[in-house]
A protein has these predicted regions:
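Active-site-proximal alpha-helix that buttresses catalytic centers in soluble enzyme cores
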Residues: 2-224
Length: 224
């Protein structure tokens, strides 16, 4: 017998006509506060993922618990504090990653309209991906498009998001219809959006001056 909230009796909106589609924008995640304890909790979940660190747990766990989680949280918390958005606990304060992810979700909701439910989820931390998928199922959203917010595919980024969604499905008696996007780095619309954002920034702040040593720097999050 399974034990998730969508099991047992049919979920609301179980009829085909009431099944509202949903889009889930999945990002990596963030500590809920810039403190050592919250950073430690986030790092433990993140660095315990076999997609992120492929070393066998028997070898990796002692290193993680005895060294990394004793040393890294305090230093990382201090760095998080320098970029943390001030204010009360709202979607506009706190982690920049959370703020801009939620804003992206709001803008997509405006674009798609009320016929589609748009939610933001995090692979690590909150709002947890499996929790968000469960809430959508309870709301009658049985067709879910899952979009990992990583243009290029990597097992440790987009791959682990799909893993987590699969774990939700494996534990669910009432399963959703799920579609995922592997990557979109070559999509013309994505490239055009980057170019448009860059052009708008230049119009507001001026173009780089090569003679003054100014350059346009493109930064990518690398993996081993």
């Amino acid at each position: 017998m399974t034990d998730d909230r969508t099991n047992g009796a049919p979920a609301p909106g179980d009829g085909h006509g009431a099944r509202r589609p949903a889009v889930v924008l999945a990002n990596l995640g963030t500590p809920s506060a810039p403190t050592p304890s919250h950073v430690r909790r986030f790092l433990r979940e993140f660095l315990s993922d076999r997609r992120v660190v492929e070393t066998h747990p028997l070898l990796w766990r002692p290193v993680l618990e005895a060294i990394i989680l004793r040393v890294r949280p305090r230093a990382s918390a201090a760095k998080y504090a320098t970029i943390w958005r001030p204010g009360e606990e709202t979607s506009r304060s706190g982690s920049p990653l959370m703020h801009y992810s939620q804003r992206q979700g709001e803008l997509l909701q405006e674009e798609l309209g009320e016929s589609v439910q748009v939610r933001v989820a995090m692979r690590y931390g909150q709002p947890a991906l499996r929790r968000v998928m469960g809430e959508l199922m309870e709301a009658g959203c049985h067709r879910i498009a899952l979009i990992p917010l990583y243009p290029q595919y990597a097992a440790s980024s987009a791959g682990t998001v799909v893993d987590e969604a699969a774990r939700f499905i494996l534990a669910s008696r009432n399963q959703p219809e799920l579609r995922t996007i592997r990557s979109f780095e070559t999509a013309p619309a994505y490239i055009e959006a980057l170019a448009t954002a860059l052009e708008q920034h230049w119009q507001s702040h001026g173009r780089p001056d090569p003679a003054a040593g100014e350059r346009l720097l493109l930064s990518f999050h690398s993996i081993p």
